[in-house]
């Protein structure tokens, strides 16, 4: 069972050895990510110059389970739209929060604006 849900920003911090990577490592065992956020990671890695195969290999090496974004999650994410609109949270952000809500585990991110939302289980890694 998943123990934490990673946002794309936390995965990218790990892969790029950015500030917060050491803290993110504490949550890596038992971590999962929404397929929406996994697509964000792949896009960012490919934008940085990696091939599709290289980005997939780098991501898969972390051992993070990719979770489907299904109809149970879309309604949870939709419910976060209005309360987070002023904070500028993206669909990816809301997908991560929806999965964390469904699994009742912390969401791991670098995005400080999430703390303003009042979601009780947010881990800011930097």
PLM region spans:
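Acidic, PIN/NYN-like endoribonuclease modules and their adjacent C-terminal/linker elements
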Residues: 3, 97, 101-126
């Amino acid at each position: 069972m998943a123990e934490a849900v990673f946002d794309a920003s936390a995965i990218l911090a790990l892969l790029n050895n950015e500030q917060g990577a050491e803290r993110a490592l504490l949550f890596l065992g038992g971590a999962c990510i929404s397929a929406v956020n996994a697509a964000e990671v792949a896009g960012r890695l490919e934008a940085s110059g990696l091939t599709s195969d290289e980005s997939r290999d780098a991501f898969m090496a972390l051992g993070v389970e990719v979770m489907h974004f299904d109809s149970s999650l879309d309604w949870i994410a939709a419910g976060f739209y209005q309360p987070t609109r002023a904070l500028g949270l993206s669909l990816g952000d809301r997908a991560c929060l929806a999965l964390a809500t469904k699994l009742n585990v912390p969401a791991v991110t670098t995005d400080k604006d999430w703390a303003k939302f009042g979601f009780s289980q947010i881990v800011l890694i930097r």
